[in-house]
Amino acid sequence: MSTLWADLGPSLLPAFWVTIQLTVYSAIGSMILGTILTAMRVSPVKILRSISTAYINTVRNTPLTLVILFCSFGLYQNLGLTLAGRDSSTFLADNNFRLAVLGFILYTSAFVAESLRSGINTVHFGQAEAARSLGLGFSDIFRSIIFPQAVRAAIIPLGNTLIALTKNTTIASVIGVGEASLLMKSTIENHANMLFVVFAIFAVGFMILTLPMGLGLGKLAEKMAVKK
């Protein structure tokens, strides 16, 4: 046990810090892209609705591993897209990290868009009709009336998406991002006799990340719920 902790201890917090960074950056990007996709999905412009619907349906039915591998092998290795300076001594690690974030954003934004659309469905259509009768355009109605109420109604689905994103960050290990699951894999390889102990350590680590998130978002949803 002491040997396990001597090998694992110094790397455990840095690995989970990478997991947290992946989650935060991906969540911010997913909210931005997901909001854009939602606006397109409910837009009066047919071509925008079609593009958004096609994107969401395609991504939601594509395995996340394929999306991450596409970003690494397709965008970087085949098309030469780099998201870090080649002169940097940490180029490969930084580039893989940012490609993973890009993949998580592309994937998770589809689920964010669906969560927001479920929130929009709770907003009474009469509010939009009243706003149109006052001369407001779609962008003003969406920004000022529909979207704020949709977010309040969609906190629980958005929270579930965020928790799923936190757990999905383990997929980043397939392109060599040094997050928690990659450390777990290497630790198991070196300490196969401590398999269940290693699993327990990392399970507790992810519970520490996700349980407070779920409880906090649940409280926020109760606080912001529309009183009827």
Curated annotation (Swiss-Prot):
In the record, what lineage is assigned to the organism producing the protein? Bacteria, Bacillati, Actinomycetota, Actinomycetes, Mycobacteriales
Q: Which UniProt keywords apply?
A: Amino-acid transport, Cell membrane, Membrane, Transmembrane, Transmembrane helix, Transport
Q: Which GO terms describe its cellular component?
A: ATP-binding cassette (ABC) transporter complex
Q: Does the keyword Transmembrane apply?
A: yes
The entry's protein name is Glutamate transport system permease protein GluC
- Gene Ontology molecular-function annotations: transmembrane transporter activity
Q: Which residues form the ABC transmembrane type-1 domain?
A: 16-217
Family as reported in the entry's similarity comment: Belongs to the binding-protein-dependent transport system permease family. HisMQ subfamily.
Task: Reply yes or no: does the keyword DNA-binding apply.
Answer: no
Note the topology in the membrane: Multi-pass membrane protein
| Entry-linked InterPro entries | AA_ABC_transptr_permease_3TM (IPR010065), ArtM/GltK/GlnP/TcyL/YhdX-like (IPR043429), MetI-like (IPR000515), MetI-like_sf (IPR035906)
Describe, as the record does, how this protein assembles with itself and its partners: The complex is composed of two ATP-binding proteins (GluA), two transmembrane proteins (GluC and GluD) and a solute-binding protein (GluB).
* A GO biological process held by the record: amino acid transport
Q: Which Pfam families match?
A: BPD_transp_1
Ranges that cross the membrane:
16-36, 64-84, 100-120, 195-215
Q: Which organism is it from?
A: Corynebacterium efficiens (strain DSM 44549 / YS-314 / AJ 12310 / JCM 11189 / NBRC 100395)
What role does this protein play? Part of the ABC transporter complex GluABCD involved in glutamate uptake. Probably responsible for the translocation of the substrate across the membrane.
Q: Where in the cell is it found?
A: Cell membrane
